[in-house]
Every structure is written in C-alpha cells, then in structure tokens.
Amino acid sequence: LNTACTSAANGLLYGARMLAADLYRRVLVLAFETPSAIAQQGFGALGLVSPSGEYRPFHPQRDGLVLGEAYAATLLALEPGPAPLARLLGGFSACDTSSLTNTREDGSHIEWVMREALHSAKVSAGQIGLVKPHGTATGANDRAECNGVRRLFGDALPPLCVLKPWLGH
C-alpha cells in the first residue's frame, strides 16, 4: 500500500477494517520510509525540498520539507494482549481532488477529514491533546493546515507536533 505521506496511517485503518470484518484475529502493519533519489528528485521537481536543509514548518522563514527515514511495526488485534501500548479508536482518510499535489488553502478539506476521524473514533475535538500535522514546511500546505486546525478547534488549539524529518515522508 503506497499512499505517500499517509501510507502508515492508511495501513492502520485497513488493518482495523480487516479485523472488524473478522477476516483475521491479528494484523501486522509494517511501515517504512527510506530516502531515495527518486523521492528527492520528485519532491525537488515540485519545488518542495528545503534548499537550506533546515526544517521550519509554520515558520515565516520556512523553505520546504526535509525528508526523513523511519521504520515501524504495529500489531493490531481485537483482543489486546496483557499490556497493550495503545488503542486505535477510529480514523478516516480521503483525497482532496481539487489538486494533484495540494489541498484547499482555506482548510475546509482538512477540517472535514479531521471531523470524520473524530466521529469515527467517537471523540470530540475538546478531547484532543495533541495534533500531528502533515508539516511539509511549504507555504500552501502550512496555510491549509493552519486554517483546517483553526476551523476545527477555534481558539482552543492543542499543541502541534511535526515529525516529518524523523518519521519520513
């Protein structure tokens, strides 16, 4: 499964769906991002890679993303073992078809996806203690994410944690 930045999250959602459909008792989700010349050239051609190499999402002097490397494995099960580390309450994924490489800068699509995810998890926006945005450190994406988060949370913004260089694209 490759859905670019959302591959690992979509892997978790698909795994959860397989469990809910009673296809499996356990699902192992493996995710990785390995730096490659193809990725670097692709993002470079789009003008998204930081020429300075400094990662500054949501900063006035941001100049693009810094690609990272990460590997992860998560075992999903309907019946947790003796010490589960986390619970997947729900989630939602969608593509913004308004553009091939961007999302709507007004944040409406991002807000909609977050609302659907909260609804799926049966959680309210007020219960969220941390938001991990996409964080490409590009003007259009930063504006879209800021607007989407602001539309959902209003003035009660939870902290943001951006991890792209440490978790990969």
PLM features: residue spans?
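Stable alpha-helical structural segments in soluble proteins, enriched in small hydrophobic residues
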Residues: S7, G11, V113-A121, L152
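Short pre-catalytic strand/loop immediately N-terminal to key active-site residues, enriched for Gly-Thr
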Residues: L1-T3, H59-D63, L160-H169
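Active-site-proximal alpha-helical scaffold in enzymes
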Residues: L1-A31, L67-P82, H169
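Condensing-enzyme catalytic core mediating Claisen C-C bond formation in acyl metabolism
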Residues: G53-A121, G129-L130
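Conserved beta-ketoacyl condensing-enzyme motif
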Residues: L1-T3, P35-Q40, A125-R143
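Acidic, glycine-rich active-site loops and adjacent beta-strand->loop/helix elements
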Residues: T3-S7, A31-S36, F92-D96, G135-A137, ...
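Short glycine/threonine-rich loop-to-helix capping motif typified by GTGT followed
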Residues: L100-D106, T136-F153
